[in-house]
Amino acid sequence: MFKYVSICLVIIFSILNAQNSDSLIDKAMELFDTRHLNAENLTESRDILQGVVESEPDNLRANYELSRVYYKLGDGVETKDEKLEMYNKGKEYGKKAKKIDDNSASAHFWYVVNVGRIGQTKGVLNSLFLVPEIKDEVNKILKIDPKHTGALDVKAMLYYELPGLLGGNVNKTIELLSKAIEIDSNYSLLYVDMASSYIKKKDYENARWFLNKVSEIENPTYEADLILNDKPEALELLEEIKGK
């Protein structure tokens, strides 16, 4: 009888611990999603997730969300070394999440986003060796979830970044971004990336249309991204192509 009581207690404590962890992760992501209201929310989000990972190293969600947070921390620092430090941390937590569950689209996505940022920070020519891995990761994500708009965007921008001789193709970029916008028309980054693609083609009329759409989004999928990143970038690009 005592054996069964012990087993029941273990199960109960496990459930309570899992519920507590879920609540902490929810709180961390609430802070992450409202970082446009308070800049300190991002580091607070990191600290909470770090605590969960330290107490539960195999918590899938905590690891891939921490990977996501480090990606944003990397975007927010100034120097190349600081950026690489943040992105590499994000990569490692994404890698851990993949090991926990190789069929997690989120684990693969935040891993590959950090890998991509490492490549962008080092420069395309210094990061060509990363391209096969990025392609493999994106294809894995889209196999798990064919409508993963983030993965479609990464794949699209890979075609945008690569030189033509190495497979770059801005028309393919536009095709993939169009597909992503059909799936989620409130994902503001897609419009900025689409505009950048048209600017590359010197099609400024279409570029302006997509840049103006950014300000028209009423219910953004990622409000903090719209306010902190996408809208300012759209306005900056509109100024750059003014009169063209």
Question: Where are the predicted features?
Answer:
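N-terminal leader/linker segments that initiate helical-solenoid repeat arrays
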Residues: 16-70
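Terminal, low-structured helical/coil segments at or just beyond the last alpha-helical repeat
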Residues: 24, 200, 206-244
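Helix-turn-helix repeat elements of alpha-solenoid scaffolds
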Residues: 34-50, 83-93, 127-133, 166-174
